[in-house]
């Protein structure tokens, strides 16, 4: 049985385990400043809730945004590191695509997330969840006149919905593989000096988890 670990740090920190078309367990932390500190403990908790071990994972899927620089970097680097340690494939998926796949609609719609600075990340979708345009980052006032969904929908006059429903979609092989390059869409708020070695994102694995 294949076991997919799904990670998305484009908004909050969200983790899910999926097998045979069903989510076995999922967890989330809503503090946007705690991505680096919370991701590995959240993965451990989700595995425990599903009575699985990290060594049972057969593939990893990670949301590559769009989203903030630091949050996306945490998720993508952690997924890449775990994939290397476990020797399993890692796919990158547009986080908005996953949100669209979990949304029922009668016609075209827009998935929106908060980009801060009075802007939103968004993409336009057909009723079947196929992406028609985007992703973009613009003021909410520039969104097309279509129904909106997603965690930033309230910024456009809609009802915000978390991307929880997209975790199963994130693990679906039907979503296009975007690679592991994060979709920042704009430069980070703060630049890390190039001469300083980054200490971010070194997941600490318990002994015996590697093959």
Language-model segments: which ranges?
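Oxyanion-binding and handling regions
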Residues: 1-22, 34-37, 91-211
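Short amphipathic
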Residues: 25-28
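Intrinsically disordered, low-complexity proline-rich regions
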Residues: 39-41, 55, 181
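Phosphate/pyrophosphate-binding loops at sites that engage ATP/ADP/AMP, CoA/4′-phosphopantetheine
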Residues: 43-59, 144-146
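Phosphate-handling active-site elements
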Residues: 48-55, 83-93
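DPxDG-like acidic metal-binding loop motif
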Residues: 61-89
